[in-house]
Swiss-Prot record:
The gene is GDI1. Keywords: Cytoplasm, Golgi apparatus, GTPase activation, Phosphoprotein. This is Rab GDP dissociation inhibitor alpha. It comes from Canis lupus familiaris (Dog). GO terms for molecular function: GTPase activator activity; Rab GDP-dissociation inhibitor activity. It is found in: Cytoplasm; Golgi apparatus, trans-Golgi network.
Amino acid sequence: MDEEYDVIVLGTGLTECILSGIMSVNGKKVLHMDRNPYYGGESSSITPLEELYKRFQLLEGPPEAMGRGRDWNVDLIPKFLMANGQLVKMLLYTEVTRYLDFKVVEGSFIYKGGKIYKVPSTETEALASNLMGMFEKRRFRKFLVFVANFDENDPKTFEGVDPQSTSMRDVYRKFDLGQDVIDFTGHALALYRTDDYLDQPCLETINRIKLYSESLARYGKSPYLYPLYGLGELPQGFARLSAIYGGTYMLNKPVDDIIMENGKVVGVKSEGEVARCKQLICDPSYIPDRVRKAGQVIRIICILSHPIKNTNDANSCQIIIPQNQVNRKSDIYVCMISYAHNVAAQGKYIAIASTTVETAEPEKEVEPALELLEPIDQKFVAISDLYEPIDDGSESQVFCSCSYDATTHFETTCNDIKDIYKRMAGSAFDFENMKRKQNDVFGEADQ
């Protein structure tokens, strides 16, 4: 342990493992430690099922009807991967895909007036959807065509819209779209959590809708992917990568102290020994004095013995409840996976409802989601504080990740990873410079 490293990483959450992997591939000498005996930190998958009951202080343990405990891998933080999104690009860039198997999530749904509907995201689906009337469908189709053709480097595609100054609200107005359509475009396609985006320049929203459509075009059914055996496989895949490139891993390793000299990190002390480093990456739990609380997320893990109603008996799906529909500021999300992903016993389903906490009674806030899931065999309720670093780490060279938010995808996490990388390396993380051949996540070469 008494050695010099370029980078020491504390915590094996996904953000930390990806950065550790990328730094190792880039030739840095990396030491990666975690005080826990398991990988994944906040973003781990819990197995066997008995362990989940213990973690939530349910001392009686799972009933026999739950099947074998080791058939379960339950994610603490529910998220799916966008098929054409940044995390998939990082997996391909680093070839971590070789350690993982993915399945396409079977459907994406949106809540309107107490019912759920499939999210239409192609012209054909939009025209067949019950979400809109006939004239609305035509206007929405025009809007989708505009977005598909939009190219920020070609003003001929702008149709009078200025990507840097026209607000998204004005773009919706231009196509005369009604409130319901605006709701599902902003929340189910562009995947915003609130309506703050409406008064921002429209370019980001257009790019988000493009990402959704491109992800959908990749594999059909939905734009989302999910790894067999749960999300805990992701940090482990990147940890393997780091090890292949010479990174050193230590689990179950207590961190006694982070050693600073003249305001700059120089090492980490553990069990009486010091490992020295030039830079440090960690999650907020390792440096409570360098982070601030930025809100809370409630996540309720529900075990079901049936698929969710009105999803066509999907074995996996996402449901978005737009804030407008339930008089809130933030959307409510449901992610559902099942025995088909090797995360639950045969015939069992795991649905996780989550949202940003807005009141003193967070459990009440997710009720609209829980109603869609009834009957529920067992609930596990977690309310987590969200933390963010108080500085950018440029002086201390201590780079702290942000907590995982309520969104059901990894795009915000990837933005954090790219942001930390840029602050550490001084240059942006460049996907285009990928040294590896471009396959897709199922190992097939892109045409």
